[in-house]
Amino acid sequence: MKFYSFRYGPFVGLCNALLIILLSGASTLRADPKTIVAFGDSLTQGYGLPADAGFVPQMGAWLAAQGASVRVVNAGVSGDTTAGGLARLDWTLAEPAELVIVNLGSNDMLRGLDPNLVYTNLKQIMDKLETKNMATLLIGHLGPLNYGAEYKADYDGAFEKLAASYDTVFYPFFFKTLMAADGVTPNLQLYFQDDGMHPNAAGVQAVVSDMGPYVLRALQQ
């Protein structure tokens, strides 16, 4: 009977080399950054701040510090309303994204626009994002009392109603960490620019630190 010797050493070496290549490729795929589109107005755009101090760069840096591989795109337009956001949504999201942070409505409120219009426009935005299978983080805003209690209730409720209607992560109030101890009065001296409306770099940092965990949760949707 004739016996054959199977020389498996070179074969094993080849398999190991192939395995290393495959694992390296898989690691590269896992390392590909997820795209987050920050879609909003001047609060998103970084009005009045140095290029590295706005919401988008600070959020990107915070997420990277938590070990998240992400690319945060600045789709903020100063002065934008919910109607303006709806009008530009399709071309803004021409490229796919894993998560869209929706931060619109504050300019509608400043202009005294009907809260029902705010709700309708944001609903259409959320519908489009849902159709595109994009995860969302919806940021809420609170109306002022000087427009009357009814306006405030309707405006505040628009965001709450949307949050309850969609599979979204809801951050209830963009400025919630920038308020004084009463939770109502803005802490102007520490966290706001001279206009009293837009956060300074320290204010953005406080917002990002508080909102960051919500973003991480939304990325898991």
Predicted regions and their residues:
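Bacterial N-terminal signal peptides
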Residues: 13-25
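Short, small-residue-enriched loops and turns at beta-alpha junctions
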Residues: 46, 79-80, 177-181
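Serine-esterase "nucleophile elbow" of acetyl-processing enzymes
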Residues: 29-78, 88-96
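Alpha-helical cap/lid subdomain in secreted, periplasmic
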Residues: 2-3, 68, 86-221
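Acidic/histidine-rich helix-loop elements
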Residues: 48, 73-81, 109-113, 196
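Membrane-interface segments of envelope glycosyltransferases acting on lipid-linked substrates or membrane lipids
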Residues: 3-4, 20-23, 41
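Aromatic (phenylalanine/tyrosine) cluster motif
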Residues: 3-11
